[in-house]
Structure formats: C-alpha cells, structure tokens
Amino acid sequence: MIIGLGSDLCNIERIQASLDRFGERFENRVFTDVERAKAARRPFTRAGTYAKRFAAKEAFSKAVGTGFKRGVFMKDIGVVNAPSGAPTLALTGGAAERLAAMIPPGHTAHIHLTLTDDHPWAQAFVIIEAIKD
C-alpha cells in the first residue's frame, strides 16, 4: 500500500547560485559524502546533480508529511544507487525514524524515487510503499 507521495521541482540555477555564494559550506550542510563525491565526478553538470538530489530530499520530506521539521534534516536523506543503478534513498537520523513510525506492523518500507532534469529544472518524485512481510 502507498503511504506517502511527494514531489519537488528545483531550479538548477538557484543551486548554482548557492554553490557560488556559499561553496563547501552549502555542500556540507545539505549533501552527504556520497552525494558530494558523485557531484565532484561531474564538474560540468555539478549543479544539476545537486539540484536533483535537493529535489529528492524535498520530495521525501513531503512524502513523510513533515517537511524539514520534527527532526528530519536534509543531510539525513541521501540519494544512492541500487545495484541495478536505479536511484533510491539512504536514510539516517530523524528521517529514518519518521519513516519507521509511518510503517504499519508487519510491513517493510520500500521507497521509489525518480529523478530528472532539463535545464534549468530538476525534478524528483518519491513514493513510499509499505509491503506486507
């Protein structure tokens, strides 16, 4: 059963402006080590790489119904790739706790994530599914 749905649209140029203005301070505050390493490998599309991940974090916060409140922080939500290459989320801290609180007993959470970009926009959709054990 679907227990959460979130989407976000992010302006890549806005992310580039934050990178230009705040540099590593912005990167370290918002993105995980894995996300920063991926962006560093993509110097010509770094802002787009970050914008998709920023949108994914926003979409997840909407899917769990809290936004960035109640202990859910951007850095607790990391975009990673499954062995198949598909994007998914790795959660820690308050984000993981909020997701666990939403899942009914006898179910396991499954997060579906899709990312896309077409300059100047990046977009993410998150669907949280509870699958019966």
Curated annotation (Swiss-Prot):
Lipid biosynthesis found in the keyword field: yes
Q: What class of enzyme is it?
A: transferase
InterPro entries, per the entry? 4-PPantetheinyl_Trfase_dom, 4-PPantetheinyl_Trfase_dom_sf, ACPS, Ppantetheine-prot_Trfase_dom
**Can you provide one Gene Ontology molecular function annotated for this UniProt record?**
magnesium ion binding
Q: Tell me the protein family, please.
A: Belongs to the P-Pant transferase superfamily. AcpS family.
* HAMAP family the record matches: AcpS (MF_00101)
Designated name of the protein = Holo-[acyl-carrier-protein] synthase
What gene name is listed for this protein? acpS
